[in-house]
């Protein structure tokens, strides 16, 4: 599984994750420090993200903001940051999200500086989940959803599996992170 095809189709009715906007903006090291017990070798991946992130950059992101996007896109084992974060965002235990608030604040302030995407983006899952959705259905994905403007990118991740589902999403307020990712 990767961040382009990670999806939860349980349609949970969860309350929003209120509160992260009001926490202090801190460095990526400080934001992720409380998660080091949950994510193996996290401090190593933070160093890699800070080394290779796009800084300086055209959108005036700080090094920590740029690294917060970069580390989200990094793939490593089952404890990749995006997997653990999205698992927490999908959890019914909303209190467990508080440990993520400093990172979410940093990540959100970074995304706020990036261009907004309006129009068609693509997402896929290597399972046939089409029966769980209807045309024009509105629902909330309780996770950070990586998409691509190119259907070919998503098809590559799906590897031509017969039972795959390809989503065409009409984005209203997406963020273009290309240029800030590991790829």
Predicted regions and their residues:
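Internal glycine-rich, Lys/Arg-flanked active-site/core loops of soluble domains
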Residues: 29-176
